[in-house]
Amino acid sequence: MKPIQTSQPVGLSRFTLIVGTLIAAAFGVGSAMAATAEPLEAKVTELFSKDLPECPGKEGLMITVEYPPGSVDPIHRHPGHGFIYVLEGSIIMQVRGGQEVTLTPGQTFYEGPNDVHVVGRNASQTKPAKFVVFWVKDKGVPVFIPTK
């Protein structure tokens, strides 16, 4: 029985794969590829919260959200009114029934308490994005509620 002929010897392709993997690991490319396969989650930092006695059951909350490159939010909603201001990078937002918008530093976006946020992501695969959100929301309810 004759061996199967290929355009490249099998031994060479294995060698190339092994050397390529070692080089990628040495230079951190493997971790960058892993980050691309599963985007990192957004980092949310609470800046300030305050009960709103004039609005019973409501509180004001200010947060920053940092999207790593390629970060994507799951579909969700928020229990209040959100006023978004982009600080750096570029983000893409859309609520159900609305148009997808790309926002850059200095631009704003609004989400209402009945909106389902169907798109929330970093527009870049290589640069981070950061925005601040001021919420007027139901007191004691998480600001992020996963939904379908």
Question: Model-found features: residue ranges?
Answer:
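A short beta-loop-beta micro-motif enriched in histidine and acidic residues
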Residues: K58, G70-Y85
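Short proline/glycine- and basic residue-enriched helix-capping loop/turn segments at helix->loop/beta transitions
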Residues: M62-E66
